[in-house]
A protein has these predicted regions:
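N-terminal leader/capping segments at the start of a protein or of a new domain
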Residues: 1-76
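Short acidic-glycine-tyrosine-enriched beta hairpin
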Residues: 137-153
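A short hydrophobic beta-strand segment most commonly corresponding to one strand
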Residues: 100, 122-123, 148-157, 163-180
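Signature of the catalytic double-stranded beta-helix
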Residues: 63-108
């Protein structure tokens, strides 16, 4: 059975995350230009309601923030409005075209990897537990808490090898230019996530 077939089967086995909800704190400025706390609160799981009837979420998938241009425009809270528009549109894929996406993802114990590719440069940080990074060639790479992965538009997947403990990772995805290797264009390939997530729309 392939990694993607195992992932599809695992959808039936897991409910929500066992890790505590995280709080997002956003800063800003008051009328005098002094730093203040703009807002705080929990971030909802963006997987809710996206699976077919009878299926359950295989992981928690929270979009903490997005930007939609380089460099980001913070004047008059333009970035906050842009983020809200992205979330409310319901069209966000894994990558936000011309911008960034910051996610917190919780992987249940013993969940196979969903192998996929995005047209993006990604930073992955292990916050809790451990995770195996699955690539097309070579042995899985085991990342421990505090380790980081720089994912450069490759086919890859993440597998929590623990039988009992959840894994939490932070991901920052940045749109990148179209990638070619030896004349072959490598485009987004969502694999088993294609039935759950929308296309990013940045590799046309």
């Amino acid at each position: 059975m392939s990694h993607n077939e195992e992932f599809a089967a695992a959808v039936e086995k897991h409910q929500g995350t066992a890790l505590r909800p995280f709080t997002r704190y956003i800063t800003g400025h008051n009328a005098e230009g002094k730093a203040v706390l703009h807002s705080s609160g929990e971030v909802p799981n963006s997987f809710k309601g996206q699976f077919a009837p009878g299926e359950t979420r295989p992981m928690a998938f929270n979009v903490a923030y997005t930007t939609s241009e380089f460099p980001a425009n913070l004047n008059n809270d333009a970035d906050l409005a842009a983020h809200e528009n992205v979330i409310q549109s319901g069209n966000l894929g894994l990558v936000n075209p011309n911008g960034t996406v910051f996610r917190i993802v919780d992987f249940p114990p013993d969940t196979p990897a969903a192998v996929h590719r995005t047209q993006s440069l990604d930073y992955g940080i292990v916050l809790e537990g451990q995770v195996e990074m699955i690539l097309e060639e070579g042995e899985p790479v085991l990342l421990q808490r505090g380790d980081v992965a720089i994912q450069r538009a490759t086919m890859h997947g993440w597998r929590n090898p623990s039988k009992t403990e959840w894994t939490r990772m932070a991901f920052i995805l940045q749109d990148c230019k179209p990638l070619e290797v030896d004349g072959t264009r490598l485009k987004e390939d969502l694999g088993p996530l294609g039935g759950v997530l929308k296309s990013s729309g940045n590799d046309q």
